[in-house]
Amino acid sequence: MRTDQVPNTTSEHPAIDLSRVHLIGIGGAGMSGVARILLARGKTVTGSDAKDSRTLLPLRAVGAKIAVGHAAENLELAGELPTVVVTSFAAIPQDNPELVRAREENIPVIRRSDLLGELLEGHRQVLIAGTHGKTSTTSMAVVALQAAGMDPSFAIGGQLNKAGTNAHQGTGEAFVAEADESDASLLRYTPEIAVVTNIEPDHLDFFKTPEAYFQVFEDFADRLTPGGTLVVCLDDPGAAALGERAVARGINAVGYGTVDAVAAHPTVPVKATILSSRVVAEGTYAVLDIDGREVEIILQIPGNHMVLNGAAALLSGYLLGADLDKLAAGLSDFSGVRRRFEYHGTVRGGQFDGASVYDDYAHHPTEVEAVLKAARERVDAAGEGRVIVAFQPHLYSRTLEFAREFAGALSLADAAVLLEIFGAREKPVEGVTSRVITDEMTIPVSYEPNFSAVPDRIAEIAGPADIVLTMGAGSVTMLAPEILDRLRG
């Protein structure tokens, strides 16, 4: 990890003039969210993106001026130069013409995390961190707080199904946001409540070693405001170890988790315990103890990992002082986030009668395992059907690093189709294809490098009442509706 890539973590930051903000890559999940909040605060917002998308239309509708394609003149979309340019250093090359123009004009260039840090100022900050589950947990916390009447501001890495947005400028004191660790961005924030859902090695293309990756969460815990609280998941070894070390260092840390996990970590004070959970027709029913009070929830999204995320969301709202019963009621109304076990439809009649198609963002072995276990629970509860997955690995480095782990996780399905690797910001690596995963798998699997042929491959192996999942962080999401259409005939 290069020191020049780590954000400024001092308590004081240079003043940033946000009167006119230009965002490079404004169509991304993170960038579009901060753009919405800037617009809601009456700021002038311009931006550019490599291609047009459904994200840009609502931003334009509320006043953003957006160009498709990158060019130096895009900095003048508002008729004058911006006061600051915002970029993602991981995704935007340094020779981008808008970045080059900004430097020539001596316009400050900052990261999205710096901008979000500015937007968080003056609020009670709830930051959700962890290798997995950030978006779902953040979304659950937002929905629960809204039900409790707190109207929080929020910035999420995915679109809330019910609200239809990924960001909002609220009237309440709280601001709930994801704290992205992939490039150490989470060290820009000073939370009152810092949630860590789990920690296991990832993003080693940036951090280089697992030790450096774990250290960023230690440093995040040190960023708490005076009187703030670190909230850790005791079911996860990495998060539990962070909590134990935090307690030993005098940091105010509390834990949440299942009964066995809570018992295994006695040095961490417990504020939320999952007493029981089971799959029911409506989703997952769970009973939790929140600081001595028993509450019941029914989550519409399946999986034990979602119950843990729900516990973190409830606990966050409780620590903010929200009414626990209203929080629980709101959580039961949570309908999910786009691309998190997102339901696309069910086939009625014909060869594939009862087969349902879902899409999920899972792109790490642990995430894949959790989603497939949730799908298996749903199939088992129905008493029929199988689990079929179309998986697109994300990043050559991650695929090579975790090939065996991916194979083990994907083998929890009954059959699989593997697409070619979605490289994103990485260049192809000679000899690294999805076959490094398929060669290790123990279930029927086909390697299909032809993207457009995947729906036909799925139709060859799917059957009635099956759950079919498209999975990955890349373009595979576009296949879910195509697969559903193919199965419907």
Curated annotation (Swiss-Prot):
Gene3D superfamilies registered for this protein in UniProt = Mur ligase, C-terminal domain, Mur-like, catalytic domain, NAD(P)-binding Rossmann-like Domain
Q: Name one GO biological process term.
A: cell division
Reactions mediated catalytically: UDP-N-acetyl-alpha-D-muramate + L-alanine + ATP = UDP-N-acetyl-alpha-D-muramoyl-L-alanine + ADP + phosphate + H(+)
Primary localisation category: cytoplasm
Q: What class of enzyme is it?
A: ligase
- Tell me one GO molecular function of this protein: ATP binding
Q: Which GO terms describe its cellular component?
A: cytoplasm
Question: Where along this sequence does the record place binding of ATP?
Answer: 130-136
Alphabetical UniProt keywords: ATP-binding, Cell cycle, Cell division, Cell shape, Cell wall biogenesis/degradation, Cytoplasm, Ligase, Nucleotide-binding, Peptidoglycan synthesis
- Give the record's pathway: Cell wall biogenesis; peptidoglycan biosynthesis
Coiled-coil annotation reads: none
Annotated compartments: Cytoplasm
**Where does the source fall among the domains of life?**
Bacteria
Entry EC number(s):
6.3.2.8
- Tell me which NCBIfam families the record gives: murC
Q: What does this protein do?
A: Cell wall formation.
Q: Which family does the similarity line name?
A: Belongs to the MurCDEF family.
Name of this protein: UDP-N-acetylmuramate--L-alanine ligase
Q: What is the lineage of its organism?
A: Bacteria, Bacillati, Actinomycetota, Actinomycetes, Mycobacteriales
Q: Which gene encodes it?
A: murC
